[in-house]
């Protein structure tokens, strides 16, 4: 079982939690607290599993994730989840989020995408008003449903954009997740081309449980601007150089990889994150599914600082790189870089 790392000083742990941060790889459904799961399951007449979120590998994790999705039945359910996700993020120093949501199963069950997005917007707006933490959305294609379903979903999403449906303006990009094994990313090229033509950003989960060749396909065929996970990229030195030269961001989730996929990453000490950074890759730090992995971004910064011996300045640089890798415009990036610089100046002196 994965254990939390708690050997860095308490003052540094507190400072890392307060440090202004952005998160680029977090799944909205993966922020659902166990109490919320039980509440929504009871409300919707669903027999809930024990709230421990127990699983042993990626396959087991996906089963848990899909069960979490199953308790989201109404616009109000999505709003509740989104609101709580903002509060959790803000309590860990997150000032800006780019959050995945994966609606394919709900749409297959008859829920309208417009209602899902509007519900998420309701919750995010309330959370933003309360905390100041802002969120944009990434429409997440579920590979399990296949390329044709992805095209259909893009058609629906783009129609909502044309009609300026509530909340759809928050959707700034598309991504793709679920099982990576034996799935050719190139088969989703049509959906990605539709998104690109509409001006949406593109990313994809690759290189968590797939080889570096799949990362190359995501970049060259799908036109991805970022890669989520991407931890196998170092297996291909030529591709690594391309990513370094183009400063293609990789949204890495070290502790989540250890917790969810221990067969590939049995311990943080064996995770390639530090080697990715040393190679010059724009590797950012994220939680993936914080409630389901008993994480927070503040804790993840602590875990990484401890595991790899990173001092305060190294962690500040990681936070800054997250801003650089975001899909914010230049003015907003400048503003958040300023928040990080101000926190560095204030906190570094206290740590000295």
PLM region spans:
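Metal-cofactor-binding active-site regions of metalloenzymes
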Residues: 2-200, 209-214, 221-226, 232-249, ...
